[in-house]
Amino acid sequence: MYEYFTKLKEPEITPLKAGFLFLLCAVWLLTGLIGHDPWKPDEAYSFGLIYHILQSHDWIVPTLVDEPYMDKPPLYYWTAAILAKLLAPILPLHDGARLATGLYTALTLLFIGLSGRELFGKNRGWAAVIALVGCLGMLIRAHEIITDNALLTGCTMMLYGYALSLRRPTLAGVILGIGIGIGFLSKGFIAPILFFFISAALLLFREWRTRAFITTLLIAIVCALPWLTIWPWLLFQRSPQLFVDWMWTHNLGRWFGFVKGGDYHEVFYYVKILPWLAWPALPLAAWAVWEARKKIWHEPEFQLLLVSFLVMLVTLSIVPDIKEVFALPMLLPIALLATASLSTLRRGAANALDWFGIMTFALLAIALWWGWGGLLLDNNAWITHQLKNAQPGYDPDFHAIPFGIAFFATMAWVVLVWRVGRSVRRSLINWATSVTLMWILLMTIWLPWLDTGKSYRHMIDDLKDNLPKKYNCIADVRIGDSQRAMLQYFGNLNPKRNASRTCDLLLVQGDRISKPIEDEIGWEKMWEGGRKGDANERFRLYRRVKE
């Protein structure tokens, strides 16, 4: 499938280089998976669903603090709960659960590498992986407790199944079907919808109207059926109402209502954010398309990647919820197209990208070290004051191990950017190495500062210290899903909704401006607090005043 590109010679990937690239990807992947609390907003509520499985052993109905949460199927939550349970003797539950993200991201890197190898030749597997690792949109999201990482794995397997279909249709069908199933059990109907439209669009091209491709599609459907039916059937057996709530209220019904309403004011959202989300792969992908423009619609590899990207872009742009994290699947065809550019990219352009990356990340590294040192030494620099204002509750302290890791990584980066051989691939490798350095610095010397602002642990500890020794129950007012999940995890507190008439305590979430609560008569405020890094989000505890 890569006839056009095999005509161009390029250096082989030696075992030593392959080992270095594997180490780079492993460091990028593993950094940040452990060592910090669940962060607001997405990690907090996602872990709340996982924590319910661990506490109740209910594997069928996703539940958040005793209330069904039917937004997504539970595959990611199952995986995270299993890992959290297995690793509980050595890791906190939330760290063990986050390793599910590491597992799915590792599978994503594996299948994007196999896709690059299948589409563009044996030397392109590592290039595809490095291109994806370097995308700025992957850095934080690929290390969070979110179901989107499992969806990304499913989409990557689907792309590999398509790429393999013209050569090994049976195996391709199995992989494609499993990818559809993983995507469905992670985020719902988006993966089957992508499969339908990508397959239909590819059949418009003569190169894909073959018996092998039809065989692949049929096998994929058969292999996907168990994934698409077993959990929904079990859910229906448990509760027909919850099944309807999941399938219609939170998924199909919302989409049909959105389409009927015609509110498309954010339809170009992904077009606007992709330039930074997919940087630097996007300009490389654009160059590959431009360079091969005369043959682009006659080469199966370009047909697959362009069709996949366009289908993802259109499909994800006409859904009720538009968020940056939902664009992650679009990074896959972009990274693979960027891989194709390495044969034709001009050396001057590669050098420009290389030096831009080195200078940018060198300045960022200096700023991170300078800011950390300023906080530790408590100097009077402007940046130190800004950092203190951003996290007013942060108490800086020196920790030898994180400092040693950060210092070693910085020195290693300086050596590597000067020692990487002169080639077009150098710009991608240096960029990915630089992104990894930034992530290491953030997850070592800067982690306590970040955790102070994103964790609810200290706020909930303070709340518990101010609770009366005896009380009946706590009612909640306007407490969000993420906050309720963390109240249960850190404080073993389960505030009840719509229970202000029966409970003797009332917990209210609001802003920093003290506003009267509903029917404030009969209540007395006994505590107020919030996360140290957020002066706007406040929690107030009231107790009922006996008349």
Language model region names:
Residues Y2-E10, P15, A172-V174, I178, ...:
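Membrane-embedded architecture of ER/inner-membrane glycosylation machinery
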Residues Y2-N351, R531-R538:
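Membrane-integral, polyisoprenol-dependent glycosyltransferases
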